[in-house]
């Protein structure tokens, strides 16, 4: 039986893993500091508008969101969370910065450990009737949740701790406007 993604999200029980809004061109400084945004790539003006729109769409569709919103400690993810969810508490979780390491030169063992930790985070079921939002970073192609566009969302269905998770759908930001027409089989 087909159900709309919107109906599923309104019922709750999902993790919405979201990549931050568009950032300025360039790279984080080699020895950046989480406390100093000027050492990092930050949101562009367009990225700020994307974040505001994202939050507006979730409120428009009346998708229940659990508080706190979880964000990586980089300024671009924190600002994305603040703009999308201005009235909600934001919890900074340093673990989600680890996703950035997956695209770098790390050992297979370190990569496996990061992915194992991602799995354990994505297995956690949110409180009944709500969805958990995590705002972090894209993964490299073919690793973890894969490449995610700016403000793209991977809808994850946790199966409980130790039982894995299912990727329900990946939605680019533009698909939020037509969420009621998107089906899950």
Model-derived segments and their meaning:
Residues 13-15, 130-136:
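Generic beta-sheet signal
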Residues 2-106, 146-185:
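Active-site-proximal alpha-helix that buttresses catalytic centers in soluble enzyme cores
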Residues 126-128:
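Feature of secretome-associated and extracellular-like proteins
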Residues 108-123, 179-185:
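A polyampholytic, Gly/Pro-enriched intrinsically disordered region
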